[in-house]
């Protein structure tokens, strides 16, 4: 083997005798054990090792609306779960306070901000690092949103672009879905790198005013390409949205999204 490292799953955590032996506590969820092991594997791969991309680059779908409480996250998660029934999909949230730790009641050791530290690593090491932080809701893969929202603010636009592009190219996904917000720098740069953008609208004057201001700003900054990629969606009134994230594959919104996939994504 090119790389050698001993790992031992024991009933206690902490360092054990042996310089090259990594101790992993067995009294934790299987997915946490997997993530610790993949993290160790990533650390073993020499920095000079390069891997060739063996699959096509993922299509990047961005969701952004200047309107608040417009079901953007519900739309994004439903889209991700519906697409993941046939494709490999990764969902990334850029919300300041996503609240996923509480919603899913899961222990999270790595998040989106942690991946920024590994941007300069080789493609092979980065791909393993990505696996070590990625979790799942059903068949949908997701990177846990940042726990401290300040980490979203401090990262520069080019860093987010580089991270998303590296994930799309070397992550092995068919689609990467970006649930975007104003919490990040460089949102226009990220939108430019999307293959398709969905912007949810509403009919009331306040919402229409926000959309008009947003589109005018894009033109002022010469970002017409974002407008060209954007599909605006005025959603129908849904009688109910599932409370649990795992249930987003059912209901009226799920039916709406599946029709959208058939007409706009599969037909493209």
Regions found by a protein language model. Name each.
Residues 3-9:
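Short, small-residue-biased leader/transition segments that mark boundaries at the very start
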Residues 5, 18-21, 86-87, 137, ...:
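Short, well-ordered alpha-helix to beta-strand connector turns
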Residues 86-142:
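Phosphate-binding loop that captures ATP/GTP phosphates
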Residues 55-96, 100:
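Walker A/P-loop phosphate-binding motif and the immediately C-terminal alpha-helix
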Residues 246-268:
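NTP-binding/hydrolysis catalytic cores, primarily Walker-type P-loop NTPases
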Residues 124-134, 144-180:
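Cytosolic-facing regulatory segments adjacent to core modules
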Residues 35, 161-252:
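Conserved catalytic-core segment of NTP-binding enzymes
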Residues 10-60:
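Extreme N-terminal, non-catalytic leader segments
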């Amino acid at each position: 083997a090119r790389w050698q490292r001993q790992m031992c799953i024991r009933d206690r955590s902490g360092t054990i005798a042996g310089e090259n032996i990594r101790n992993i506590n067995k009294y934790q969820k299987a997915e946490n054990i997997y993530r610790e092991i993949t993290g160790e594997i990533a650390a073993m791969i020499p920095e000079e090792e390069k891997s060739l991309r063996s699959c096509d680059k993922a299509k990047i779908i961005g969701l952004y609306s200047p309107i608040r409480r417009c079901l953007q996250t519900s739309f994004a998660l439903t889209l991700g779960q519906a697409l993941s029934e046939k494709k490999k999909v990764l969902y990334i949230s850029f919300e300041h306070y996503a609240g996923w730790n509480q919603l899913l009641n899961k222990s999270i050791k790595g998040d989106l901000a942690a991946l920024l530290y590994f941007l300069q690593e080789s493609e092979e090491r980065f791909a393993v690092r990505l696996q070590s932080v990625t979790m799942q809701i059903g068949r949908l893969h997701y990177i846990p949103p940042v726990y401290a929202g300040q980490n979203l603010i401090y990262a520069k636009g080019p860093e987010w672009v580089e991270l998303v592009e590296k994930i799309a190219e070397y992550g092995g996904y068919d689609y990467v879905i970006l649930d975007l917000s104003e919490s990040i720098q460089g949102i226009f740069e990220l939108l430019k790198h999307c293959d398709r953008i969905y912007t949810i609208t509403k009919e009331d004057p306040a919402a229409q005013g926000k959309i008009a201001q947003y589109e005018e700003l894009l033109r002022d900054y010469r970002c017409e390409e974002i407008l060209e990629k954007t599909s605006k969606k005025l959603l129908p009134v849904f009688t109910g949205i599932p409370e649990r994230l795992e249930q987003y594959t059912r209901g009226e919104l799920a039916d709406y999204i599946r029709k959208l996939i058939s007409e706009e994504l599969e037909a493209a």
